Amino acid sequence: VVERAGGKLTVTAMLLKITAQALEKFPKFNASLDFKNKEIVYKKYIHMGVAVDTERGLLVPVIKDVNKKTITELSIELGELAEKARSKKIMPDELQGGNFAISNLGGIGGTNFTPIVYRPNVAIMGVSRSTVEPVFVDGEFKPRTMLPLSLSYDHRLIDGAEAARFLRWICEALENSLITMF
């Protein structure tokens, strides 16, 4: 369906959709800290940045209202923004307004990394390369795709237990992705 519409179904596109649902369930991760007014700002919208590797360095285009878009729409927009970033055609307003970001190094490789939270955001998720690993299930080894995820977050707002629940929710949604995405 996605490919017929001109998009490409990627892990990042799936994570955008699933993470938007997680941000609705865990609103602290979709907030920011306003140091001037000394308050927490809970966003009523979900705008997500996606790190794109370019020859000029990392750029983070923002997809607006992720929670209101289909997986097909997200796949197409992600591809268009990434291409604009790589071809130096991205506009400044397309790099602003994100509340949460995803950085996917899977195409480069590696097993884990720690992304840095971009202020005023309070969290960012890192995605490493997926692998197929043997997992012991019901008395036998079965092949399972493993996707290493990492989460960096601001402890002034989010504690470790909340972060673990947030990331666990995303993992469970990925395991049941056909139910949550379409």
PLM regions: where:
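C-terminal catalytic/motor cores of large multi-domain enzyme assemblies
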Residues: V1-F182
